Amino acid sequence: MSNVYERWKEFYEDAISRDIPGVKTAEKIAYFGIGGSGIPGEVLKLLDLPVEYKLFRSYKVNVDSKTTVVAVSYSGNTAETLAGVKRAQELGVKEIIVITSGGKLKEIAESKGYPLLSLPQGYQTRFIFPYIFTYLVRILNQSTGSNYRVQDLVDGIQDNFTMLSEVSTRIANRITGKVPIFYASDLLPIAERFKQEVNENAKYPAFFSQLPEANHNEIELYSSQQGNQFIPIVIPSDKIDEATASLINAELIYPPYKSILKNISGMFLIAGLASVKLASQLNIKAEELRIIPKIRERTHNLLMGG
């Protein structure tokens, strides 16, 4: 399954080349998405956003009629996102931009004339991050007058692919036999993505935590025998992060670039490759999901009826 991540450069390029519908100037933006469709909205917080931005990774949403909603569901049938869209419509939201591969959400977009950005079918949601996030940056540029260079997402992979792959191998090897806790401050969404990738691809326990908050509670666990079962991994963005890493003997993953978009694509690639390499070591099928589809179905029945 690592070959999917090895195609990410191609995915970014394809997402950049695709036509996207015109979107209106936004006063406020709200993002609806959960799971693999939710983390792109979390990562968007790493950019310098010129408008008010809210992220809803739940079916409980609170927006007004002046808000531009970006609703993302890879399958198009995610109950939480569909419920959020229904609530946004009830609250008078007029501009709802839809990113999906099909399903009920696509039907809603087509029937209401909402701007629709299509995703390729046949993948697990986490593998399609390049499409979703590229679309988001392009929407941001178009709706707010931002000028982010989307080509940086491609360059973040192609400029140092060999190095990124080597780092992923190092991380996979360090995790084996330990429970990783990924720490970050300014780059917390990247730490969360590492955690998610290890969970889904390797079916392996992993957690993430925020610095410097963890310096005032969590890091004390490394002074005990119980702490030996964990491997701390720090994604540093300042001297305090580095000081923490030194104190708890953490593994470090340094963002390799000055450009935030290059760091996002590069670090997300490391996370994906590391998780499938760990899965391979554990003889786990990275692409296979057994429990998540069951809770999706139960959630859909609870929220949408069925």
UniProtKB/Swiss-Prot annotation:
Its EC number is 5.1.3.42. CDD domains: SIS_PGI_PMI_1, SIS_PGI_PMI_2. This is D-glucosamine-6-phosphate 4-epimerase. InterPro entries: Glu6P/Mann6P_isomerase_C, SIS_dom, SIS_dom_sf, SIS_PGI/PMI_1. It catalyses: D-glucosamine 6-phosphate = D-galactosamine 6-phosphate. The active site is at E200 (proton acceptor), H216 (proton donor), R296 (proton acceptor). Keywords: Isomerase. GO terms for biological process: carbohydrate derivative metabolic process; carbohydrate metabolic process. Gene3D superfamilies: Glucose-6-phosphate isomerase like protein, domain 1. GO terms for molecular function: carbohydrate derivative binding; glucose-6-phosphate isomerase activity; mannose-6-phosphate isomerase activity. Transmembrane segments: none annotated. It comes from the Archaea. It holds the Pfam family SIS. Involved in the synthesis of UDP-N-acetylgalactosamine (UDP-GalNAc). Catalyzes the conversion of glucosamine-6-phosphate (GlcN-6-P) to galactosamine-6-phosphate (GalN-6-P).
